[in-house]
Amino acid sequence: MRRFALAFAAGLLAAPAAFAADAYSLDPGHTQVRASWNHAGYSTQSLLFRQVGGDIKIDFENPSNTSLNITIPVAGIDTGVEAFDKHLASGDFFQADEFPNATFVSTSVEKTGDATLKVTGDLTIKDTTKPVTLDVVVNNSGEHPLGQFIDYYKGEWVGVTATGVITRSDWGLGFGAPITSDEVDLFISAELKKN
């Protein structure tokens, strides 16, 4: 965190020509989108979305120029229980056969601290689009230390963690609510490589 904060501060002081919105790609092996919820007061359960991708542009000098257009495949939902995965993909929830992807498109990015951002965007699930705000922590940025051993990791990288809360019934995912909580916690962890 300290290393990023120093790098971020240095970036803010650098000449404007040195920085612009650079394109980054998500590393599918180190990017996870998790959702968790309260199961009738008895436990906390979660699911994992895999193979998240999209178009990402990051501007360290002016974070408001940063943009995200993220695609989240819902057909590959993973809870660890095959029968539940199939139920979540059904018409009671994501209706994955008709709507195979959810999307998140940023509408604003605000710097809130040395290594923190508030990202607001439009989340589309099925045929419903509503705004969502994520609190983002930039864990690190710069040359990936694994680059000295593995060619894939050579170059500039950024690591982030993001959290947020949605009300699932707002997107037509309200089956079982409120016995099973309508509020769902989102947790995103990602590594991004500069193109």
Task: Please name every model-derived segment.
Residues M1-F8:
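Bacterial N-terminal signal peptides that target proteins for export
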Residues A14-A18:
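N-terminal signal peptide c-region/cleavage motif recognized by signal peptidases
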Residues A20-N195:
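Low-complexity, acidic/polar, glycine-enriched regions of mature
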